[in-house]
Swiss-Prot record:
Disulfide bonds: none
Reactions catalysed according to its record: 3 Na(+)(out) + phosphate(out) = 3 Na(+)(in) + phosphate(in); urate(out) = urate(in)
Subunit structure: Interacts with PDZK1.
Cellular compartments per GO CC: apical plasma membrane
Top-level taxon: Eukaryota
Keyword Glycoprotein assigned: yes
Keywords: Cell membrane, Glycoprotein, Ion transport, Membrane, Sodium, Sodium transport, Symport, Transmembrane, Transmembrane helix, Transport
Function description: Important for the resorption of phosphate by the kidney. May be involved in actively transporting phosphate into cells via Na(+) cotransport in the renal brush border membrane. Plays a role in urate transport in the kidney.
Glycan-linked positions: N47, N56
Name of the protein in its database record: Sodium-dependent phosphate transport protein 1
Tissue specificity annotation: Kidney cortex and liver.
SUPFAM superfamilies registered for this protein in UniProt: MFS general substrate transporter
Source organism phylogeny: Eukaryota, Metazoa, Chordata, Craniata, Vertebrata
CDD domains, A to Z: MFS_SLC17
Organism name: Oryctolagus cuniculus
Length: 465
């Protein structure tokens, strides 16, 4: 049976925990901006008229424009530069998941964010030295950003009352959805007016400013924070009594491997990032093939799904908490409902995009809905691990994120293979494969998912390897 949480309400939107969630929202916007900006500035950085006539060296660049130096990097080198940040993020997930329960989150996130921002500032200089150095910089950024994105889940183990987990986590994580929309809007303007190096300087400086505020605002334990009212401290502490101490014990690896609810979460994370990556990475390609618009209009249209995904993500978290606070559905039912919506609706709207869209507006509408509806998973499987095992939440998030990233990388590769082999029927094959993966994941989740603390995650357990 689901946990029964205290129904009394504490201070809400004027409370410090919501200030913290909003701050993490902006922090995640900065992180995703630093991650994405190279993909957009690469258009200005590369000499597209001479990709095959010169070797891949940064020394061979146009000297007539010091504000916008241009390099002769082949598409292969560009691909390595693009992917290098994901290798760093991929490698760090499980180590960060483990040490987050041991070391200070304030120091871990703060130093990682500062290093990522510092590297961003030095990327133009690295590009001038050689493509090897920019690859190294991006790997380091992947490691530091992977640290921030995974370790931040530990914040809500101590700061989020059970009845507010959905809205607090969705508020903070939705920064990853709004960030791309902002980046797509401002990066082109900065490149044209100030030069592409200023993109890295600006986002790096923003990261340093956010890092400074982080060290001032955040405390690992709300009980120690001087700006949190006594009433709010008591509310948070009393609401978290049922989950027990958050002190890390030895990891119950065997119990985790045997846990079907954890496997259900893992499958859904794989399906979510498969869907999200396929929809986001290939949205510009799909728009170009269906609407044949110019690149500037394509960029604007491609940014709209991010905006609506952000709106849906925030709505999902608030709605999930509303249903739970009113006892309208059990927590397990809520998690299953939002996961099913987030994985099944993209299938419906993607098929509508292929077979029912007959004009510009219907195509864009179905495209936005297919992207945005996946954000309902923020109220479902994506935060379900916090219900099952608060003590090991960040470690589990590291593992499930690693599994999900595998789905994301595989999705892009498979979609590329389909598009290169059979452009005529490729989109149907891509959507069909996504449908199969999502449906299987939802069925498994509906059968095995739970939302109460598992026996192996309770304080009395001392399961060892």
């Amino acid at each position: 049976m689901d946990n029964q949480f205290p129904s009394r309400k504490g201070p809400c939107f004027c409370s410090f925990r919501y200030v913290l969630a909003l701050f993490m929202h902006f922090c995640n916007i900065v992180i995703i901006a630093q991650r994405m900006c190279l993909s957009l500035t690469m258009v200005a950085m590369v000499n597209n008229t001479n990709l095959h006539g010169s070797p891949n060296t940064s020394a061979e660049k146009r000297l007539d424009n010091t504000k916008n130096p241009v390099y002769n990097w082949s598409p292969d080198v560009q691909g390595i530069i693009f992917s290098s940040i994901f290798y760093g993020a991929f490698l760090i997930q499980i180590p960060v998941g483990y040490i987050s329960g041991i070391y200070s989150i304030k120091k871990l996130i703060g130093f990682a964010l500062f290093l990522s921002s510092l590297v961003s500032i030095f990327i133009p200089q690295a590009a001038a030295v050689g493509e090897t150095w920019i690859i190294v910089c991006r790997v380091v950024q992947g490691i530091t950003q992977g640290t921030v994105t995974t370790a931040q889940h530990e914040i809500w183990v101590k700061w989020a009352p059970p009845l507010e987990r959905g809205r607090l986590t969705s508020m903070s994580l939705s920064g990853f959805l709004l960030g791309p929309f902002i980046v797509l809007l401002v990066t082109g303007i900065i490149c044209e007016s100030l030069g592409w190096p200023m993109v890295f300087y600006i986002f790096g400086a923003c990261g340093c400013a956010v890092c400074l505020l982080w060290f001032v605002l955040y405390y690992d334990d709300p009980k120690d924070h001087p700006c949190v009212s006594l009433h709010e401290k008591e509310y948070i502490t009393s609401s978290l009594i049922q989950q027990g101490s958050s002190t890390r014990q030895s990891l119950p690896i065997k119990a985790m491997i045997k846990s079907l609810p954890l496997w259900a979460i893992s499958f859904c994370c794989f399906a979510y990032l498969w869907t999200y990556s396929r929809l986001i990475v290939y949205t510009p390609t799909l728009i170009n093939s269906m609407l044949h618009v110019d690149i500037r209009e394509n960029g604007l249209l491609s940014s709209l799904p991010y905006l609506f995904a952000w709106i849906c993500g925030v709505i999902a978290g608030h709605t999930a908490d509303f249903l739970m606070s009113r006892n309208m559905l059990s927590l397990t039912a809520i998690r299953k409902l939002f996961t099913a919506i987030g994985l099944l609706l993209p299938i419906v709207f993607s098929m509508c995009l292929l077979y029912l869209s007959s004009g510009f507006y219907s195509t864009i509408t179905f495209l936005i809905l297919a992207n945005a509806s996946s954000s309902f998973c923020l109220g479902g499987a994506l935060i379900n691990a916090l219900d099952l095992a608060p003590r090991y939440y960040v470690f589990i998030k590291g593992v499930t994120t690693l599994i999900g990233m595998t789905g994301g990388m595989t999705s892009s590769t498979v979609a590329g293979l389909f598009l290169s082999q059979d452009p005529e029927s490729s989109w149907f094959k891509i959507f069909l494969l996504m449908s199969i993966i999502n449906v299987i994941s939802v069925i498994f989740y509906l059968i095995f998912a739970k939302a109460e603390i598992q026996d192996w995650a309770k304080e009395k357990q001392h399961t060892r390897l």
